[in-house]
Design a protein with these regions (language model features):
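A conserved short coil-to-beta-strand element within the FAD-binding core of flavoproteins
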Residues: 127-141
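FAD/FMN-dependent oxidoreductases across multiple families
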Residues: 242-305, 325, 347, 390-391, ...
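Active-site-adjacent segment of FAD-dependent monooxygenases/related oxidoreductases
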Residues: 45, 49-118, 222
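Core beta-strand elements of the Rossmann-like FAD/NAD(P) dinucleotide-binding domain
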Residues: 4-6, 153-164
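Helical substrate-recognition/capping region of FAD-dependent monooxygenase/halogenase enzymes
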Residues: 2-7, 11, 27, 83, ...
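N-terminal Rossmann-fold NAD(P) dinucleotide-binding loop
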Residues: 17-18
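Glycine-rich FAD pyrophosphate-binding loop
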Residues: 25-45
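Conserved FAD-binding catalytic core of PHBH/FMO-like flavoproteins
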Residues: 114-118, 138-140, 164-273, 277
Length: 577
């Protein structure tokens, strides 16, 4: 077998590239991160961290390191030019185990992501390496980089070989240009100036989106006493004006007394972008993060969208590297992630349009907001963050719940016959393609732990209230062993001890999980399934009645291009695009 320098070359040491390398390392594979700079970027860019990203950081074993640099339950208020609150975004549920929104200090978080690579002997971060060449050689890639001194002098040129390469080097991505894919979308002409200050002169912990017709602004309370302001520049204001201290003081004077006394940490200008690459894959080369899509900042989803990319791609690369799946599995990365990234861009662009309305449009907006706030259903739509598009994978590594066929999964699900005599199902929607919940649970070894700590970071087959092996034939059990599928039985806490005794002699090990909070019972109670198969990224790959388990697993094998027990080479069964 040919030996390569590493398994995956990651181009760019931003949060996406570092997270991807950590996720590859935690699953036992090698990754080399090449970064053109000689150090991590030391100024904050992203300021919002959501529960999905935290779940990923927990999977990577990094959340405990990162948590001290965050503020949970970051409340966001949209206010008009007079300061009246038009809408409040303050979700308090924790479906995925963590508060829905956090503020964070990105440079400190990025340092922890970089330090996390030291845990793995097969991962490394190389600064001062600017990638200048890519070559797809069929069974591997060759990545060429110039090693330059901090003064810019060329020291050496190196070429690394790897099974795959992933470009995570931002919006001006060399990798994307090498791939030759279109970067579709638009870049609005509006420019913004960002100011970060120490010793927060306001001291409030939340976020204000100022939809002020005179000059839209953003004011954000961040950890460690940092305050961020963002101000829109008018078309007749040159960018160079931001270098004038008097101009900057005039922007800040409406928000804080004595702006000249502020301790400015960082100041810069930027332009919002809304773009997405036409494809996230070309052969053995992939795009992730800003290299794949540029996200307007309004909902704080740029950082989080990139982490979703890393979460999705990392387990698929790991499966192929371990010969658990064929290369065809990697085609589902672009299939699954591109649509959601595009949807998130659209929502962010709409939010920006609401912020930038003129006097007449702003007045109409304020009237509409007042009317919507009178209707609890519509008010909660904003308060509970229900307008945020949640990832739902309709094509890819999914099995349709109604037909148990691979590659596509319809959101709607109609119960039929007498097979699922449930009533008031959750909106008649299938859970397939959605992220599974993460309550705190009990086991024989620990109490009150997060579900992911029990199920782990690979495949899980779970049933409610029964022994999952009762529904599996010999071929299914062989599949479970081959792909290290964890078998789990969710039980009411009152039945956990009984189940542990009862299932002790089952043909495969079963982890019994006590549902101490009732969250798992509530989840199954309104869904027409008694069995779920969870992917390594905690999304539901299949859901069915317990007796349908063999059909669901057979379809999953095809949807994920998984290898079989007897195959010498990985199978290459196609997945619907």
């Amino acid at each position: 077998m040919t030996t390569f320098d590493t398994d995956v070359v990651v181009i760019g040491a931003g949060p996406v590239g570092l997270t991807l390398a950590n996720l590859i390392g935690v699953r036992g594979h090698r990754a080399t991160v090449l970064e053109a700079r000689h150090e991590l970027i030391d100024y904050p860019r992203g300021v919002g961290l959501d529960d999905e990203s935290i779940r990923t950081l927990h999977t990577a074993g990094l959340w405990e390191r990162v948590e001290p640099y965050t503020v949970p339950h970051h409340v966001v208020r949209l206010v008009n030019g007079t300061g009246r609150v038009l809408a409040t975004n303050n979700p308090r549920t924790q479906e995925f185990g963590y508060p829905r929104k956090h503020g964070f200090v990105q440079p400190l978080v990025d340092k922890e992501l970089a330090a996390g690579l030291d845990r793995f002997p097969g991962t490394e971060l190389r600064f001062g390496h600017k990638v200048t060449g890519l070559e797809d050689r069929g069974d591997h890639v060759a990545v060429t980089a110039e090693l330059r001194s901090p003064e810019g002098e060329l020291v050496d040129s190196v070429t690394l070989t790897a099974r795959y390469a992933v470009g995570c080097e931002g919006g001006s991505s060399f990798t994307r240009k090498w791939m030759g894919v279109d970067f579709e979308g638009k870049s609005p002409s509006t420019r913004w100036v960002v100011v970060d200050v120490a010793n927060d002169p306001i001291g409030t912990p939340s976020v204000y989106l100022g939809a002020d017709p005179r000059r839209p602004y953003v004011s954000i309370g961040l950890p460690q006493g940092i305050r961020r302001w963002e101000f829109m520049l008018h078309d007749d204001e040159p960018t160079e004006l931001c270098d004038d201290p008097a101009f900057m003081r005039s922007l800040l004077r409406r928000h804080v007394p004595d702006p000249a006394a502020l301790q400015v940490i960082n100041q810069r200008t930027f332009t919002h972008h809304g773009r997405v690459a036409a494809d996230f894959r070309k052969g053995r080369v992939f795009l992730a993060g800003d290299a794949a899509h540029l996200m307007p900042v309004w909902l704080g989803q740029g950082w989080n969208s990139g982490i979703r990319d890393a979460t999705n791609l990392a387990w698929k690369l790991s499966a192929v590297l371990a010969d658990d799946a064929s290369d065809a599995l990697l085609d589902t990365y672009s299939t699954e992630r591109r649509k959601h990234a595009s949807d998130m861009i659209d929502v962010n662009m709409a939010a920006g349009a609401v912020m930038k309305m003129g006097r007449f449009g702003g007045a109409m907006r304020d009237v509409a907001a007042s009317a919507l706030n009178l209707v609890p259903k519509w008010k909660s739509y904003f308060t509970e963050l229900r307008f945020k598009p949640m990832p739902r994978y309709a094509a890819g590594v999914v099995v349709d719940q109604a037909t148990l066929t691979p590659g596509r999964a319809r959101a709607g699900f109609k119960r039929g016959g007498g097979l699922a005599p449930f009533v008031d199902s959750a909106g008649e929607l299938s859970p397939v393609g959605l992220q599974f919940i993460q309550p705190r649970v009990n086991t024989s070894e620990a109490a009150g732990v997060l579900l992911d700590d029990v199920t782990g970071d690979w495949w899980t087959l779970a049933t409610w209230g029964t022994d999952p092996t009762a529904y599996l034939n010999a071929a299914d059990l062989a599949f479970v062993r081959r792909h290290r599928v964890k078998l789990v039985s969710f039980m009411p806490e009152t039945q956990r001890a009984w189940a542990e005794r009862q299932f002790a002699d089952s043909p495969a090990p079963i982890t019994v999980v006590g549902d101490g909070t009732g969250a798992l019972k509530d989840w199954f109670d309104v869904r027409a399934c008694g069995l779920v198969v969870l992917r390594p990224d905690h999304f539901v790959a299949a859901a069915c009645l317990t007796r349908q388990a063999p059909r669901a697993l057979a379809a999953l094998r095809r949807a994920a291009s998984l290898t079989t027990e007897s195959a010498d080479e990985p199978t290459r069964e196609g997945v619907a695009a």
